[in-house]
Amino acid sequence: MTEPETTCKGFEVNHLVKQYANADKPVLDDISFKVEHGSVLVVLGPSGSGKSTLLRTIAGLEPIQGGTISINDQVIDAGKPGTERAGRSDRSSELRTRIGMVFQSYDLFPNKTVLGNITMAPVLVQKRDKSEVEAEAIRLLGRVGLADRKDSWPHELSGGQRQRVAICRALILHPEVLLLDEITAALDPEMVREVLDVVLELAKSGQTMLIVTHEMQFARAIADHIILLDLSLIHISEPTRH
């Protein structure tokens, strides 16, 4: 019996070029790779190799000057020469929410509670029902071990707790692809373990993820595939997640 073809084919970058104004050469030049649906791709590389820039262009926070970014064979961004000085891509808000991103710096709103931080975007941007969004937010907080902190303020949380809230804030938008940029870089070993446990659970649940990290142990624990970004993308290995 033939298996039915899935409608979720993955995420793909083809011949991506990113260059900043007045730069002698692109920071990303002819970059191509694919992340299969439900898998985890980890990007390693030295400082200044363009890892964070790669994630920012994929998230639509910066325009690309060449190539394409696609989800499930649908192009969501295409390179436009002459956009080196532009602040963001011209991707629509609907397309933006198909990709979620969590930064190293958390970026939580200090004047909103944990619950308020998580529910703001789906209510204001996606126009979803507030009560339903709040119920989902509470469920997400339970998944990351923070069900009792929904009314807390960001300054009352540890770094690991704030990072878990940031992950919930991205997940509640139902992204098809989740980008994680050095999310353990500023955390102590105990907090790294807290965040790694959450990411491992996401991987087991089938969340497609693209992760930038400098920690090889973290990479090997979570990755289906690892690539190195330096002057080019080099396939390293296909570790067994454990």
Label for each model-derived stretch:
Residues 178-181:
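Catalytic Walker B motif of ABC-type/P-loop ATPase nucleotide-binding domains
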Residues 153-157, 161:
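Conserved ABC ATPase signature
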Residues 76-100, 130:
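ABC ATPase NBD coupling module
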